[in-house]
């Protein structure tokens, strides 16, 4: 993890990675999933300290009752080197420091890798989010 630094970011900085995330989700699951909207948005990026390249990001939506984090995304060259863990750790520290009352992390239920990552970090399934079937109104 020492070769990755995490910092808060502006929406404009995460926009390119958000596009990569959506494209990857569409390939993996046959449909894109939407990251949180920028209203009330909080963002973090993970930078490779050697190259300065942004190799991951996390987004969250802040509400009076708490914060929903998701997605936590890393580029291929940021995977299996602690980038996701560094992002999650920075978010957890921020949540504690700012006294956000409730934090939850959203992950696509079909994303086995994402679910396994969060379980290994001490998270468990909680609230279920329902999405319309393909072709249904609102899909």
Language-model segments: residues:
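Acetyl-CoA-dependent GNAT
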Residues: 8-70, 75, 88, 131-135
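Conserved GNAT acetyl-CoA-binding A-motif
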Residues: 95-107
């Amino acid at each position: 993890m020492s070769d990755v630094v995490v910092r808060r970011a502006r929406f404009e900085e995460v926009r390119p990675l958000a596009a990569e995330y959506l494209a990857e989700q569409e390939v993996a699951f046959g449909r894109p999933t939407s990251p949180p909207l920028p209203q009330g948005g909080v963002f973090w990026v993970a930078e490779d300290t050697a190259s300065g390249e942004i190799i991951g990001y996390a987004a969250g939506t802040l509400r009076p009752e708490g914060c929903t984090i998701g997605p936590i995304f890393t580029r291929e060259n940021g995977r299996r080197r602690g980038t996701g863990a560094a992002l999650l750790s920075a978010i957890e520290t921020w949540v504690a420091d700012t006294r956000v009352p409730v934090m939850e992390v959203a992950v696509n239920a079909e994303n086995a890798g994402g679910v396994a990552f969060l379980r290994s970090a001490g998270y468990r399934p909680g609230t279920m989010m329902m999405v319309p079937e393909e072709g249904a109104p609102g899909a």
